[in-house]
């Protein structure tokens, strides 16, 4: 259960964005949780941003694709997308969800040629198998709308959130990846022509 501090309409959020627009070079990125659980909000806020020439990005798992999400994507310049694993069984172990919806989302982004930055969470013992890394890189290298890949080394900073939610944190014993593992993963991804 989330503790909502306050709620904002897209118009109220846009007023906050405008206050800092002169001080930042980038645009607006909506992340979460999962922003596409509120696609009407994303579409409305991004439309306001686009009307003033601001760049828009959404950070998503790509698990949800429906007409409202497609509408939100019309006003989205860039999608930051997590593909946590390419093996469906291992993806389910890592996320608790099936991979297929995310693959459908990726296919849609490919069809509309929407620019993507892919995020790969490197979790020792879960997403660091060399054969899986090659399969992942081979898949991603076939997506011509992928502009770059970011390797996100696993960390334990989210552990407290799980405690507050009274949920079991299955990765509590996992250590962050070593510099060597990050370097090896980077080399594998680059060997497929990916910009890392």
Regions found by a protein language model. Give the residues of each.
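Catalytic cores of large soluble enzymes that bind and process phosphate-bearing ligands
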Residues: 5, 128, 177
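Short glycine-enriched, charge-decorated loop/helix-capping segments at active-site entrances
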Residues: 2, 92-98, 166-174
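Conserved AdoMet/S-adenosylmethionine-binding subsite of the radical SAM
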Residues: 11-157, 161-164
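A structural motif corresponding to the C-terminal lobe/cap of the Radical SAM core domain
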Residues: 138, 147, 163-188
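Radical SAM enzyme core and accessory elements
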Residues: 191-196
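Canonical Radical SAM [4Fe-4S] cluster-binding loop centered on the CxxxCxxC motif
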Residues: 1-7
């Amino acid at each position: 259960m989330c503790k909502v501090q306050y709620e904002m309409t897209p118009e109220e959020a846009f007023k906050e964005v405008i206050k800092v627009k002169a001080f930042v070079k980038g645009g607006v990125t909506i992340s979460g949780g999962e922003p596409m659980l509120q696609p009407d909000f994303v579409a409305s806020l991004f439309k306001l941003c686009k009307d003033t020439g601001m760049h828009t990005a959404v950070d998503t798992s790509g698990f949800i694709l429906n007409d409202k999400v497609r509408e939100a994507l019309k006003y989205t310049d860039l999608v930051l997308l997590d593909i946590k694993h390419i093996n469906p069984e291992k993806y389910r172990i890592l996320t608790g969800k099936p991979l297929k919806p995310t693959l459908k989302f990726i296919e849609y982004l490919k069809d509309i040629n929407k620019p993507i930055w892919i995020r790969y969470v490197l979790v020792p013992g879960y997403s660091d198998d060399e054969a899986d890394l090659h399969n992942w890189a081979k898949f991603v290298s076939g997506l011509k709308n992928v502009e770059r890949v970011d390797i996100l080394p696993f960390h334990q900073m989210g552990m407290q959130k799980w405690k507050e939610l009274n949920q079991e944190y299955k990765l509590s014993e996992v250590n962050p990846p070593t510099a060597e593992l990050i370097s090896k993963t980077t080399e594998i991804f680059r060997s497929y022509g990916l910009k890392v």
